[in-house]
Amino acid sequence: VDTLGTDKNCETMILRIGKKISQFYAYLSFYCDSMFNDPTGRRLWGQMMVQAIRSRNYASMPTSKITSNYYYKNYPEGKITTLALLGTTECLMEEEYISQDWKLADSTKIIHGYQCRLAECHFRGRNYHAWFAPEIPLNEGPWKFNGLPGLILEVYDTQDHYHFTLIGMQQEGTEPVCYYNFRPNYEKIDRIKYLKMSASRTHKGVDPEIKKVL
């Protein structure tokens, strides 16, 4: 979502939960990175990009519409790792893996057949509402959200700048959850540098969240 304007972008995101780590990333980023790791796929990607530009159908470009980041929650090590491509720089940022300070509410609703409860928190300068399913005993969720007694099936900030909602679930026939090594060389940076580089890359200035931590 464009938090500084009125345009909204939607993208299919993937949350994969393993015994020791979880992954969260855009499906289109994974698709493109997989293509780039194969010479034939790389040529196909180039052809798709050229066709999109020539036809001015920019929505068909084989690139992520919102984020190319990969997020990993490492349970044993207690850290969240973000792998990001900022401009031409491959970056790796590590943070402490902590839970949000959730406050449970009385509201309930059904999401994909699961009875969900409402929880609220303030995180990184925004107020969030999350709907979690107690019958799915995983204290996980999209992006950096976690720490509720059930899987988070929907979460959004109160201004609806960011909104994640479950569209499907698969439990059988999946590959083991692991770190993807699409880009072997990363520059390790801290969160403040990451936010500065992100602001510079978007050319939209520094948003309120970044100002809070600088």
Predicted regions: what they are:
Residues V1-D101, A105-T108, Q115, D160-L214:
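Extracellular or lumenal secretory-pathway regions
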Residues I111-H112, F123:
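Structural motif
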Residues R117-N181:
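Gly/Pro-enriched, hydrophobic low-complexity segments
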